[in-house]
Amino acid sequence: MRSAQVYRWQIPMDAGVVLRDRRLKTRDGLYVCLREGEREGWGEISPLPGFSQETWEEAQSVLLAWVNNWLAGDCELPQMPSVAFGVSCALAELADTLPQAANYRAAPLCNGDPDDLILKLADMPGEKVAKVKVGLYEAVRDGMVVNLLLEAIPDLHLRLDANRAWTPLKGQQFAKYVNPDYRHRIAFLEEPCKTRDDSRAFARETGIAIAWDESLREPDFAFVAEEGVRAVVIKPTLTGSLEKVREQVQAAHALRLTAVISSSIESSLGLTQLARIAAWLTPDTIPGLDTLDLMQAQQVRRWPGSTLPVVEVDALERLL
């Protein structure tokens, strides 16, 4: 016997969270809970404003239609990426095919004062990996901050993300302020320039490795080994079903590229599932999941070690 519930939720964000020039005041999304007999599976559907093609209202319509079809015996996945991902996670939990083991080691995200990151990294056991958003301020400032961090922590490797913010000139201004002796400790820089060709040229000219992120979701993208390209950053909420995520990871690994499972600012429920997916598909790579502290609460499932208050399922708005 099948049954299902759909919940709508909204989490207040910390002040100062900006996505593509818009301030994100709340994180809005949906949960689906599928039950069959004694088994249960959850999934999160939370399109990311400015990045997802669909809104959460559109996702809600597609999700409710899919749930009704599933209750009637149809299991075909929807095409909308955020819904396909959430539904496939719920189905995987239901079938017990999403392993429980999780990688909760997140590369800490530097959102402001580099001194805060230095203190956080001092306590980090094992491999020291952190992420810094660049492209939000002047490229020269970004270069100086990155250089400071690499100089202060000799065993640090940085992941940088520019979200295609730079012109070729700004990319050169950034690189000018990063000591060439430190550049090999930039694990990769995600999408430095507005076009892939400019990003490739940046990698050639600076010796700083790059990673593809937004490019993975463009229709003309193909997985190929290229000089200067070291990694792909896979955001499942923006990608689609678990199977599509797995296919992308396998395609990257076949080319000896690093595949990084990364957050689209999901709630704690979605983040714990991403930690499980990372342990399953990319066991040797620290995932990019350090986004929970951008929110003011956890929901339904806790992230280990977080002190944020937890909103239980009874407090959510039920749609079905």
Curated annotation (Swiss-Prot):
Pfam families: MenC_N, MR_MLE_C. Mg(2+) binds at residues 161, 190, 213. Keywords: Lyase, Magnesium, Menaquinone biosynthesis, Metal-binding. It catalyses: (1R,6R)-6-hydroxy-2-succinyl-cyclohexa-2,4-diene-1-carboxylate = 2-succinylbenzoate + H2O. Converts 2-succinyl-6-hydroxy-2,4-cyclohexadiene-1-carboxylate (SHCHC) to 2-succinylbenzoate (OSB). Belongs to the mandelate racemase/muconate lactonizing enzyme family. MenC type 1 subfamily. This is o-succinylbenzoate synthase. It comes from Shigella boydii serotype 18 (strain CDC 3083-94 / BS512).
